[in-house]
């Protein structure tokens, strides 16, 4: 059984990967500003400058693969397909967040 997967580097694939990196960067910059304004409580360790790592690695995952992050997990969650609004709502402590506003930056999870 072969569990490896090759990502085709077509122009469309490359553009999709780039767009995901941009989504992560924009989301993280917004969260950093919100944290400075006191809207995000607790620690908020952003993934700025590391976007390509998650996007490149996660491009090789299957949709049913499970991911556990230990540090700066926002980019991982977004690269795996978490909607940015769910991440932002989570860090704002809202019920509409991926962890119903209870996990925050350090304990993201999506059932």
Question: What are these regions, as identified by a protein language model?
Answer:
Residues 1-17:
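Charged, compositionally biased N-terminal leader segments and the immediate start
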Residues 12, 35-36:
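Short hydrophobic/aromatic segments of transmembrane alpha-helices and their interfaces
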Residues 29-33, 39-111:
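Cofactor-binding active-site loop characterized by glycine-rich and histidine/acidic residues
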Residues 19-35:
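N-terminal glycine-rich anion-binding loops that anchor highly charged ligand groups
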């Amino acid at each position: 059984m072969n569990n490896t997967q090759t990502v085709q580097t077509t122009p469309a694939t490359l553009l999709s990967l780039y767009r995901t990196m941009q989504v992560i960067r924009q989301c993280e910059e917004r969260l950093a500003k919100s944290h400075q304004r006191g809207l995000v409580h607790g620690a908020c360790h952003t993934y700025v400058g590391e976007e390509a790592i998650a996007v490149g690695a996660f491009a090789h995952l299957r949709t049913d693969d499970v991911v556990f992050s230990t540090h700066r997990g926002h980019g991982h969650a977004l690269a795996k397909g978490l909607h940015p609004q769910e991440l932002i709502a989570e860090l704002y402590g809202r019920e509409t967040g991926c962890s119903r506003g209870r996990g925050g930056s350090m304990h993201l999870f999506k059932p």
